[in-house]
Amino acid sequence: MLEKFTNIFRIPDLRKRILFTLALLAVYRLGGHIPTPGVDANKLQQFFEQNRGSFLGFVDLFSGGQLRRLTIFALGIMPYITASIILQLLTVVYEPLAKLQKEGELGRKKITQWTRYLTVMLSAVQSFGIAISLEKGQGFVLNPGIGFILMTMLTLTTGSAFIMWLGEQITDRGIGNGMSLLIFAGIVVGLPRGVADLYDKAATQAWGPFTPFAILMLIVVMIVIVAFIVYVERSERRIPVQYAKRVVGRKVMGGQSTHLPLRVNAGGVMPVIFASSILTMPQMIGAGFKNNRYFGNLIHAMGWGEPLYTLLYAVGIIFFAYFYVSIVFNPNEVADNMRKYGGFIPGIRPGKRTADNINEILTRITLVGALYLIIISFIPEWMIAGIHLNHLPGALGTFFERLPTWVTNGLGVSFYFGGTSLLIVVGVAMDTVTQVEAQLIMRHYDGFTPRSGRIRGRRTW
């Protein structure tokens, strides 16, 4: 294994990409220590410590712990992700954008440019909401007023635009997906703080006699979740494909059997990130309007752990799982390419029948993948922050009030132990290793796994 790691640095291009990625990640972490002017960072951090199991803790997870200190990178990559989702949705429902996307590299560059503009607009709106919320807070702002609001908007919007640039540079000139790696870096850096928090709870017997069992249960659940994530992320449905024999000159070509691999979770962590970014935006914008008689109830209902939020989060994950697959995989193109090269699925007529068959299988396994993402995302979060079933209206709420307090309020530990964070860390790590392995195999080196880079342990569904 050590030799395979040294192979990375024997390839100049791969070595350059990895070092470039690490350098930009270091810049990202450095920016996380530059505070936004005019904010009492100590009071703000104390407030986050008191609300670590709430929605604020969840949002802070995606900013890499920078929201609690309100650094220049406090918005993280959420504005960029939200802008990307909006543009991708518009390409489906708005015909001129769909035509622009099909124009090739020039069209994609135009859409990317519009995504950047929309990112800046969303960052300005979110930073305005944060500034208003801070002014209404408990002495967080040193000098309230229009000057503080404008300075906060300028600082956070500029920081968000710079993060967007960092992510694009990593994707283009580094290794892995830049945006995912930025989230990954923020979560990994915060893990020691989560471990220290868990140790403090154990030392102070935070949950009374239930403390040892709660910690043991949390550790066991984390191990099981990591194993489950690795298992499902490596799982695929293999559709058998047969190629007919063809005579080319004096040679007989084709005739071999192969398969078409369809990943159970083709979207990876993106559906979870997309759904999270969409649902966090109303909270960040509306944080300063919680006492408003028109929007207060809606903002409260959209709070973390509330039944409405839970329902919308689950629906969002399912929607974006299908939406992402529809973008990255086109059954009609796959079927057409198979037909051109003489390939067919045994028992299925080439052409439209083949496309329909692939689409049917893809629909089923995507649902399995979406349900897997929901399970991974929700079960640990219920343990950490609880699910407020007692807030349901009428008799349902009264019935669920009988549940133990830790079920409705959670254990109150850090979100770094949640399913969403584990899913992102494991998923991004596996995707990055796969890209590095592909670079090694392409240059005739063995990958990290035996048999010349062939990944063992694949599971079929």
Where are these regions (language model features)?
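N-terminal cationic and glycine-rich segments that engage phosphates or anionic surfaces
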Residues: M1-Q101, E105-W461
